[in-house]
Amino acid sequence: MSIDRKTHILLVDDDEIDVMNVRRAFEKGKIENPLFHAEDGLEALEMLRDGSIPKERRLVLLDLNMPRMNGIEFLKELRDDPALHGTAVVVLTTSDEERDRLEAYHFHVAGYLVKPVRFLSFVELMTTLNRYWTLMEMA
């Protein structure tokens, strides 16, 4: 019996190009973690609650600007749910606004990353995040 030591990553982002860039960055950075995708906060909560994503070793990469339920609304709902409140979340957004950062950290996010414009910078960002999360899981 083998033990799955990979972190299951849920990308919550409505922008098709950003989703494609994350997938490409995973491939280019040789990141083998399972990647799930939700279009918005409502879909993400449904996936987390219905078992679509294993409960152990999961990380949410969260955009802030989305329809139906934005990232901050998602964080509030997530932290209010006893079954989900401990889920690790890293904000991955184009917003460099201090107000957005403060509001996200108010909901105990593990990090706040601004999406780089250049693809190679994006690959480096995803690879670094993967290394960091792997080290944190080993601790």
Residue spans for each PLM region:
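Conserved Asp/Asn-Gly motif in the active-site loop of CheY-like receiver
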Residues: 38-42
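Short, glycine/charged-rich "phosphate-handling" switch motifs in NTP-dependent
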Residues: 110
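Conserved phosphotransfer cores of two-component systems
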Residues: 51-55, 79-86, 107
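Conserved active-site segment of CheY-like receiver
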Residues: 14, 91-96, 116
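Non-catalytic signal-transmission and effector/linker regions of two-component phosphorelay proteins
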Residues: 1-10, 16-34, 49, 53-56, ...
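Receiver (REC) domain active-site loop signature in two-component systems and cognate sites
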Residues: 66
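Active-site residues of response regulator receiver
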Residues: 62-63, 93
